[in-house]
């Protein structure tokens, strides 16, 4: 009797199963939108990710770096932040998606997209940890499988990021040597005429340079932990890259710059003819940038700024280039600017066209100054003076400054039309000034390197100039009522508010272990202690 019951159950189940299978198949057929792709080419995802690398000038980063200052309340003040950071985990989700799509297409993880994925993971995690400190990393990006990931220490984030960068270099070197270089979606190198070729080999060579040049930046940013974090091996990693260019190629000229190039069709530089009427009289160059250039008799002052004619000096007198101290009250800056005693943006450079200059993400000049700093600190051998001077000359080249006669253009005193001057600028004269000539591998020499590196960051590279100040105190930043926060410059951002609500226990544990339970913008993270 029992046997018959079982048999009957099986017989009855078969048509039900067949019916269910048939319905499921029809449901899948009807529910699919055949106008939408089931897969996305990895190159298309890469394009989106690469757009996330650039930080456009004119936002809060420019003020945090003290490159620009507002003198008019309606268009914003110069106060530092008081709240939370934006953490770009969405870009990392796209990296994972790109890697998955590339693996589908190639049938293996060994493809150029995966190599670039290593670099991009390091880039975005370092960017985020520098803002707040510890972060979810090893348990992050798992979606509903783990909605409350634990936080990894900042030290572990840097350690893993350096490992990713090493893996990226190794994988890219293998692809370049063995011809597996076909990829798309790289509009920084692959789609520019200088680097374009049929296979993508030239672009991958450039990306290998990006990886190692960026690794130098990361190692330099760890300088305060170089002697007490033995497992990071900071000095030796730096020496390995510096001493073996065949294995670890780095940038060797401005041609290698990782940069965002503007055009006059649809990608406008943020300052352009369209916003001249709103911005031109209400924004000044910051004193930390411009006054320093003027004091160094540096022609970059004339490229970036208009002369402050209220001072009564000649247009091409370096004393005419005075920036706005961001620490001053906004009403003071408004009065100074109205009296022509602080400099406005150079009209010809920023407002006459839609393209101004490319925005640097990582530059040859920065690499030069990183190398000079590493040598100055004794991390590797070499000629710090040569790297230092090459970095300065690279920035002259970036702005189109020639060794000899240069044309500089200013707005006429009446506000209409322009006046052009010929200014002789000899590189050798500039470099031989006592204040510029490298003083050797001592603290004074390091200050010179960091000062020129700050100038090289002008209106590019995101928060790198601020991070340098936070790490070294160089250059001296202007503080006061104008910068807010009780006359102090914050050392970090708070965590996003959704961390305290959606991942509360792990958030509280991280804040307690780092900042004694206070998510305070004025407390130092591990990186800078």
Q: What name fits each language-model region?
A:
Residues 1-32:
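Bacterial Sec-dependent N-terminal signal peptides
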Residues 23-75, 79-82, 86-89, 97, ...:
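Membrane-proximal, proline-rich intrinsically disordered regions
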Residues 44-55, 120, 373, 450-458:
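Short, hydrophobic/amphipathic alpha-helical patches that form generic packing surfaces
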Residues 66-120, 124-404, 442-444, 452:
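Structured, solvent-exposed acidic/aromatic patches
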Residues 396-529:
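C-terminal functional modules
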């Amino acid at each position: 009797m029992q046997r018959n019951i079982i048999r009957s159950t099986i017989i009855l189940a078969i048509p039900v199963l067949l019916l269910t299978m048939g319905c499921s198949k029809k449901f899948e057929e009807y529910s699919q939108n055949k106008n939408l792709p089931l897969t996305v080419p990895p190159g298309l995802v890469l394009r989106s990710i690469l757009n996330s690398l650039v930080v456009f000038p004119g936002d809060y980063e420019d003020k945090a770096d003290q490159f620009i200052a507002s003198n008019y309340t309606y268009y914003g003040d110069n106060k530092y932040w008081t709240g939370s950071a934006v953490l770009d985990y969405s870009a990392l989700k796209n990296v994972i998606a790109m890697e998955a799509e590339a693996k589908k297409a190639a049938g293996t993880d060994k493809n150029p997209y995966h190599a670039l994925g290593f670099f991009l993971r390091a880039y975005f995690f370092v960017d985020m940890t520098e803002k707040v400190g510890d972060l979810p990393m090893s348990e992050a990006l798992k979606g509903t499988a783990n909605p409350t990931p634990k936080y990894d220490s900042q030290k572990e984030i840097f350690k893993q990021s350096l490992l990713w960068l090493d893996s990226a270099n190794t994988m890219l070197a293998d692809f370049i040597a063995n011809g597996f270089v076909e990829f798309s979606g790289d509009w920084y190198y692959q789609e520019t005429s200088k680097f374009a070729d049929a296979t993508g080999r030239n672009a991958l060579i450039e990306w290998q340079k990006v990886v190692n040049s960026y690794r130098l930046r990361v190692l330099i940013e760890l300088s305060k932990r170089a002697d007490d974090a033995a497992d990071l091996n900071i000095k030796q990693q730096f020496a390995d890259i510096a001493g073996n260019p065949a294995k670890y190629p780095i940038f060797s000229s401005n041609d290698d710059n990782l940069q965002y190039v503007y055009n006059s069709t649809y990608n406008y530089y943020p300052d352009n003819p369209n916003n001249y009427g709103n911005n031109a009289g209400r924004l000044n160059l910051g004193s930390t940038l411009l006054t320093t250039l003027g004091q160094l008799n540096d022609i970059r002052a004339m490229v970036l700024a208009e002369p402050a004619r209220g001072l009564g000096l000649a247009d091409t007198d370096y004393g005419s280039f005075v920036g706005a101290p961001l620490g001053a009250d906004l009403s003071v800056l408004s009065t100074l600017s109205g009296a022509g005693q602080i400099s406005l943006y150079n009209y010809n450079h920023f407002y006459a066209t839609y393209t101004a200059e490319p925005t640097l993400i990582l530059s040859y000049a920065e690499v030069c100054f990183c190398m000079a700093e590493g040598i100055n600190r004794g991390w590797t051998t070499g000629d710090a003076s040569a790297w230092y001077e090459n970095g300065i000359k690279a920035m002259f080249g970036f702005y189109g400054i020639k060794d000899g006669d240069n044309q500089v253009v200013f707005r006429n005193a009446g506000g209409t039309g322009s006046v052009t001057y010929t200014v002789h600028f000899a590189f050798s004269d500039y470099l031989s000034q006592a204040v510029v000539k490298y003083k050797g591998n001592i603290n004074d020499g390091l200050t010179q390197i960091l000062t020129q590196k700050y100038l090289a960051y002008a209106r590019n590279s995101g928060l790198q100039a601020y991070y340098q100040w936070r790490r070294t105190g160089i250059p001296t930043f202007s503080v006061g009522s104008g910068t807010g926060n009780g006359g102090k410059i914050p050392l970090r951002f708070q965590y996003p508010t959704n961390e305290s609500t959606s991942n509360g226990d792990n958030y509280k544990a991280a804040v307690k272990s780092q900042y004694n339970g206070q998510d305070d913008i004025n407390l130092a993270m591990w990186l800078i202690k």
